[in-house]
A protein has these predicted regions:
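Short, basic/aromatic recognition patches
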Residues: 2-25
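A short beta-turn/loop motif at secondary-structure boundaries
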Residues: 32-34, 84-88, 127-129
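Short helix-to-loop capping/linker segments positioned immediately adjacent to catalytic or ligand/cofactor-binding
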Residues: 13, 25-31, 120-126
Length: 159
């Protein structure tokens, strides 16, 4: 591995993880300091940045008052791990912070994720009693293990 495999920039090969049906495993910190990990649907957007151009922000849609939302409200540090659905040896781990929580567009966003992950036009578990919320994560450190290091392992696995 080389220094290019550790970055703070979501490069195109890393962004591809967010385009498929790859689950993100979101790690947050519980009140007692222990880790809490949740598999979750995950998304990415480009955000306008005033002087540095564009920055990519990771979106996680959850329900208000779920444990992960409570945890990031108290401690915004998160870790996200993803593996490529086509090559589970290719992976990315992202450390970052939740920089914003918003309900704006959260219902529409969960429908968008349902389309990608379930091929459904609408999220099947919509409920008027559950308020959706989007967690916006700014990456601070990224580790990427690209296919050039993992193709051999994948070939061995298919034998």
């Amino acid at each position: 591995m080389n220094k290019d495999d550790n970055t703070t920039i979501l490069t195109e090969p890393i962004v591809k993880f967010f385009r498929g049906k790859n689950f993100g495993f979101l790690g947050t910190v519980n009140k007692d300091g222990s880790p809490q990990v949740t598999p979750t649907w995950i998304d990415i957007i480009e955000k306008e940045e005033n002087k540095d151009g564009h920055e990519k922000i990771i979106l996680i849609n959850t329900a208000r008052d779920r444990l992960k939302q409570k945890n990031v409200s108290r401690d915004p540090r998160v870790s996200i791990s993803m593996v490529d659905e086509d090559n589970p040896y290719s992976m990315v781990t992202i450390k970052g912070r939740v920089v914003e929580q918003t309900t704006d567009g959260a219902d529409e966003h969960i429908d968008k994720l349902a389309k990608r992950y379930l091929s459904a036009d609408r999220y099947p578990a919509h409920s008027p009693t559950i308020k959706r919320i989007i967690l916006k994560v700014k990456p601070e450190k990224i580790f990427y293990l690209p296919p050039r290091y993992t193709d051999y392992l994948q070939k061995l696995n298919k034998k």
